[in-house]
A protein has these predicted regions:
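Asp-based, Mg2+/Mn2+-dependent phosphohydrolase catalytic module
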Residues: 1-4, 113-217
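N-terminal helical cap/lid subdomain that shapes the substrate entry/recognition surface
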Residues: 2-89, 100
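Structural motif corresponding to alpha-helix initiation and N-cap regions
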Residues: 39-42, 88, 92, 144, ...
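Short, acidic loop-to-helix structural element flanking the phosphoryl-transfer center
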Residues: 79-107, 113, 144
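Short glycine/serine/threonine/alanine-rich loop segments
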Residues: 35, 64, 103, 156, ...
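Alpha-helix N-cap/helix-start and coil->helix boundary motif
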Residues: 20-23, 51, 55, 92, ...
Length: 217
């Protein structure tokens, strides 16, 4: 295989979770925090997560105070505790084949590490490393620190790894480390976002099978 290590996003790359967990939990929180404001549509939410990213959606656009951010995270935790999202079809079988070829599987996510391990616990896959939300702002996505740590910990060159993500903050994080990127285009996105991602990144795949054929062959 050309690549020794996968650096995986989780939400809407490995699992179908924005429409079932992250968006409804955000709307539930904002309905209490901003009851007089029109709720974001799903496309608007995805758009803001794309640019400027979820953290800045909370701080710069919604202008949540620290207590409001704590409340939003509390509601989010209630949803993530209650719902385990499903993996996209063929995703786990792709990882199994990659692992059989001695590949390294890592996850860099804005979800919490415990939710990543929970998602994978009923599969045959145990990630070799997970960098989640609780690592601290200067050590978590979209800061390039997790990618640098993966390269260092596993003694990899940038070209030995490839990052797979559905949104710009993660893809940009990899590009800053000269790590190749794949756009996970199998989760629905507004046309403007899809067009931008297809134009600005190394590889763009509409299905998990296309990704598997590229990585494994």
């Amino acid at each position: 295989m050309q690549y020794k290590c996968l650096i995986l996003d989780h939400d809407d790359t490995a699992v179908d979770s924005t429409a079932t967990i992250h968006y409804p939990s955000f709307i539930a929180a904002t309905s209490k925090l901003r009851p007089n404001e029109k709720p974001l549509t799903l496309d608007e939410f995805i758009g803001y997560c794309f640019n400027p990213g979820f953290s800045k959606l909370c701080t710069d656009i919604m202008k949540f105070t620290p207590p409001e951010q704590t409340y939003q995270q509390k509601v989010w935790h209630e949803y993530t505790d209650a719902v385990v999202p499903t993996f996209f079809p063929h995703f786990i079988s792709f990882l199994e084949e990659f692992k059989r070829n001695n590949g390294i599987i890592t996850v860099v996510t804005q979800s919490e590490s415990k939710d990543i391990y929970k998602a994978y616990q009923n599969t045959s896959i145990k990630p070799d490393a997970v960098f989640g939300w609780k690592k601290g702002q200067d050590k978590r996505k979209p800061n390039p620190h997790p990618v640098k740590r993966i390269l260092s910990d596993f003694e990899l060159r940038p070209e030995d790894a490839i990052l797979i993500d559905d949104l710009e903050p993660g893809l940009k994080m990899a590009s800053e480390c000269n790590v190749p990127t794949v756009v996970a285009a199998w989760s629905p996105k507004p046309a403007s976002i899809s067009s931008f991602l297809k134009t600005n990144h190394d590889h763009y795949f509409k299905t998990v099978d296309q990704l598997a054929n590229f990585i494994l062959n």
